[in-house]
Amino acid sequence: MPAYMTFFPLGNADTTLLRLANDDLILLDYANMRGSDPTDKRIDLPKALRDELDDAGRDSFRVVAFTHLDDDHICGASEFFWFDYARIHQGPDRIKIDELWVPATAITEPDLEGDAWSIRQEARHRLKEGYGIKVFSRPERLAKYLAEWDLTIEQRQHCIVDAGELVPGFSKYDAGQCEFFVHSPFAWRTNTGLEDRNEGSIVVQMTAREGNSESYALLGADINHETLSQIVQTTRKHGNEHRLHWDVLKLFHHCSYKSLSSVKGEDITEPVEDVRWLFEELAREKEIIVSPSWPIPEKSTQEDLDAQPPHRQAANYYKKIIKDSNGQFKVTMETPTRSNPKPIKLKITAAGVAVVFTAAASVSSAAAAVPTRAG
């Protein structure tokens, strides 16, 4: 059975839905950004996700991952999901989470409010009770917090997953035909020992298998080029270059130039070497790059002068690198058109990854396009 990936039009915000071969649903981030203005082109995310659950025959998400706790990744989560820690977040209209994935800061960060506070409370509750959670962290980073609950790392090891590991519970050889390799958060070795880096952000490589074919996607939170370079260096050091291959790349930080370099450039952002190697050498043929963002601005417009992403210069780099491999560059808020953006749905089969009809409401009604990679 094929797997599917869906990217929702939410402006500069992230929500990605993975539908595995067995119809289990994995949600990466939840950002309900649509306002009350009827002209708002951003999708009604709660309705869209309920429709996806119905189409898959599921009443809960196998996994909900909050890749980091900025509002553009979690907005409205405390109003949509069933949280076990408090009855105020429970009710017949709320959607349950079988397993919660969070970065270390969802446990350790003291100064949170709103949706971030609620997610932290739910994460702490599940970790304390020892069920339904994976904390992406170096285990030692959580020792102090576990000790406050009279718990040890060993007692909660099954709830913790570190960089360089596969997330337990998933295999490309089981019914879901999918696995996840953890790149971040990670520890960076310095002269004084290990230093935790990017502990607020999850980055994973997804491998989806069908038949004898595998397809890969790089997915994660808002990280800059320095962190991305360290991920590349660490992965290469451990001989895991294959864990950086990708057919699908969900851009980090809404097509910001800062994920490529500290220098924006006049018309194109030239990446630092490690990032260039990742994006140019490890991309598979006919790759698909998705920018979860507002439309790419035209040169010299007011939007182009805005310091916030998306940045035209970064987009020009991505458009350049796909030309040699017949790839595709998609922007959530301009696909299929700027006036009427729809979810971008990718279908993963033994023939490769295909963009399916973006106006389709569900997998069962989607019309497939030509696969982006053969073999």
Task: Pin down the residues of each PLM region.
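Active-site neighborhood of phospho(di)ester-bond hydrolases with catalytic His/Asp-centered motifs
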Residues: 27-31, 60-74, 101-105, 217-226, ...
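Long, structured stretches of catalytic cores involved in phosphate-ester chemistry, encompassing
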Residues: 226-332
